[in-house]
Amino acid sequence: MANIRPALALRNALADTINTALNAGSGPATIEIYSGTIATNADTAIGAQVLLAVLTCSDPAAPSASASVLTFSSITGDSSANATGTATWARIKDSTGATVFDCSVTATGGGGVITLNTTSIVSGSPVSITSGTLTVPTT
């Protein structure tokens, strides 16, 4: 099996590059949580997926990476969800609205990049993420 094992300095630089992309523009990044099938890639326009909630990152989103981990600063929840549905994925955007990346959303223990205590979102109810980390793998 072919693989790459980047040095810690490179892993930190990769995480910091994501952080730089999150912090583009003059305001905070956002986390848009959707139901439905995740887009083919982060450049694919949203189709029939339903926007359930929008959360707001701090500005900047995170301090510099340490030990190849980007630890997000506080994330402001959505006090009133946009729609009712099952959260399955998220699109993370910078303050200009440009997509930075898409990722999976699952309930705690489900292995998603974003984990929620429940993926059942109810319109008008609060949605929150208490913490967030992004880890650049060692292989």
List PLM regions with ranges:
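Small cysteine-rich, disulfide-bonded extracellular modules of the LU/uPAR three-finger superfamily
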Residues: 1-88, 94-139
